Amino acid sequence: MNFYPFHIGDYISHTSHLSNEEDLAYRRLIDLYYQTETPFRKNLTFLARRIKSTEETVALILVEFFEETEEGWRNKRADEEIAKYH
C-alpha cells in the first residue's frame, strides 16, 4: 500500500507513553507493515536493521502493538485496512 489512513487522535491516545525512540520505531514498523502487506517474520535483528532501531526497542513495540502468530507478527488494525484496500 502506498497510503493508509492515519488517525491522529487514536495514535496519540495509544502512544503518548512511548519514548521518542519507541515512537519512531512504532511508526516505522507500521509503515513497513503497510508497505509489505505481510506479517513480520520472527527475526528481531532483521526488523531492527530495516527500521534503524535496536532489537530491544523493536521487541517492546512488537509485544505491545502486534500479535505473534504462526505466520509472524501481525497488526490487527493494519490487516483490516489492507483487506479493505484489496
Language-model regions, residue ranges each:
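Detector for short helical micro-motifs
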Residues: 1-86
